[in-house]
Amino acid sequence: MAFAHHAEAAQSSIVSGSAPGFAAGVTGGGDATPVYPTTIDELKEYLTSSSPQNIVIEGTFDFVGSEGTKTYQACNIYDCTPDNGGQAILNTLGGCGDTSTYDVTIDVAGYQGINVASDKTLVGKGTGAVLNGKGLRFVGVSNIIIQNIEITNLNPKYVWGGDALTFSDTNQIWIDHVTTSSLGRQHYSFGQESDNAITISNSFINGKTDYSATCDGHTYWGLELVGSSDQITFYKNYVYYTSGRSPALSGNTLFHAVNSVWADNSGHAIEGTDNGMGLFEGNVFNNVPTIVQSGFVGQLFSSESANLSQCETSLGRDCVTNAYTSSGSFSYDDDGFFVDFENLPIVSAASASSIASTVPSDAGNTLSST
């Protein structure tokens, strides 16, 4: 699809800061007069409208039950069931195979997110702006800012029960200070269509869950990145209590992870197939015994002391080393994909030690002054 150019529109004053990394220049609703929805219907109307919108929300917008319920077939394919801390899988894509199925009832609102239209800014006022039981979808759209909200409670008992943030065929989207928790499936799901100029920053992937596919209170469903030519800056995020897909780096995704913290992972962090490409610098891995799953076939650069200067040509500076505490090895020096960074806006990187404590405390919907 063709995307409009938005450089002429100023970013609204309701937004804190400006997008770092690949999404630099995003303006969202631009200079549109802010609107303040008080009901879920008003919020959906503004998010899906054809005109630019600057949307400010405060408090909890509770979608649970708003679209009714629906019965699906499900099965238990994991070692634990929802009754003892596990997840069942909805048989929507035939994932149950020959395993016996049974009827379950899910909340329809959580199953699929709101289809956000182009040229939108959504900002939470204070630290309590929550979408309870509803995610957000970005499909064939551009120029969007989402800041200072939490998305939670998307049919967490059931795999395929709901993704927090879904992207497909998009351009210039900035996700900032967003908390995601208690989900049926992915915190971030990038489809096979290209997603360009994406930045996820200052956000909290809270994987602690009552319903775990790995039966240990950790979510397996972190970030699924399978786009044909995605560009994602991952800056100052806190990835906590996951057991896999953190990220699943596949497709032809260019993933620049800078000054983020991975903590308390019970399985593995990075996995992937195909030609996923990841540059990791200035990050902290704390209690992540397996950083990269065995058999990863993409390209990774882990910014070791001996190879930092390899970044100079494409990034305009040396890379910054990562830091490790009670974690496994992470030693990769694939740099053949560095040419893909040329002419892209590159975020600066601080030392890992300087962000080790600030990122976990600042990430998520923590902006009290918005």
Curated annotation (Swiss-Prot):
Catalytic class of the enzyme: lyase
Disulfide bonds: C75-C96, C311-C319
Annotated EC: 4.2.2.10
Glycan attachment residues as annotated in the record: N307
Record InterPro entries: Pec_lyase, Pectin_lyas_fold, Pectin_lyase_fold/virulence, PEL
Active site annotation, chain numbering: R245
UniProt-recorded Gene Ontology molecular function terms: pectate lyase activity; pectin lyase activity
CC per GO annotation: extracellular region
Keyword Hydrolase attached: no
Location (main, coarse): secreted
UniProt subcellular location: Secreted
Family label: Belongs to the polysaccharide lyase 1 family.
Function according to Swiss-Prot or TrEMBL: Pectinolytic enzymes consist of four classes of enzymes: pectin lyase, polygalacturonase, pectin methylesterase and rhamnogalacturonase. Among pectinolytic enzymes, pectin lyase is the most important in depolymerization of pectin, since it cleaves internal glycosidic bonds of highly methylated pectins.
PANTHER family xrefs: PECTATE LYASE 18-RELATED, PECTIN LYASE A-RELATED
Protein name: Probable pectin lyase E
Gene: pelE
